[in-house]
């Protein structure tokens, strides 16, 4: 995608960059949580991944709606919008992969583990822990219009 953007001289608006940075930080945190939980066999940390994944999905949906607004107001072109949407879809896929890895971790040691996330009751969304983490991440990664967010595309090492 970055090559396509460079070759076609595609540029996002500052608002689009700000929004992408928020969801990108959430994805980075989810990847770091997933890696640390997996490397340390930390099932407690693994339970933080699903609520963060739901926040990422929600953010991506919200940002797609913001893109539609920019498109309808003439503040964004189709080419930029296609790349923007592709990036958001990639973030969603990363979140799903992290959740799948954590299902495998949380079910490891079970006598008959069913590793299919869609059948899994491993992430009860009605638990107090899930709601607590969800609320924490919702506040941390809230999209606020016209608020300055640091624009960073630098790679980050797993902590």
Which sequence ranges carry the predicted segments?
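Cytosolic, long alpha-helical scaffolding segments
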Residues: 1-159
